[in-house]
Amino acid sequence: MTSDSIGDMLTRVRNALAARHPKVDVPASRLKAEIARILKEEGYIANFKVAEEGVKKVIKIYLKYSPNNAPVITRIERVSRPGCRVYVGSGDIPRVQGGLGINILTTPRGVMTGRMAHKEGIGGELLCQIW
């Protein structure tokens, strides 16, 4: 049992990309499904689906690679952790790699990218950065 389920999900994705696996399974939760939805919308993963394996639900994340078999996700980092939460206002949302990457935030209006949160003028907890 891990105390940081989002960190565990990001680590599983990072390890699967390093090993060039076509997909990775992570234990399901609504927050992890929302993070996977954003990754799909932004083009970082090919697809995902929530499936039931026996009693437990899992999220199957289908990873995306470029034509020369390099992972589309160069780096994926956890920012806010259970031991050190990081909250940002709408004006304090950092740019990732000069605008080439994305932030994922959890806000009062749900999970969204840093760009969407800035556009709506809301801040929240900065979960992770991807580029």
Show the residue positions of the predicted features.
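Core subunits and conserved enzymes of cellular information-processing
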Residues: 1-131
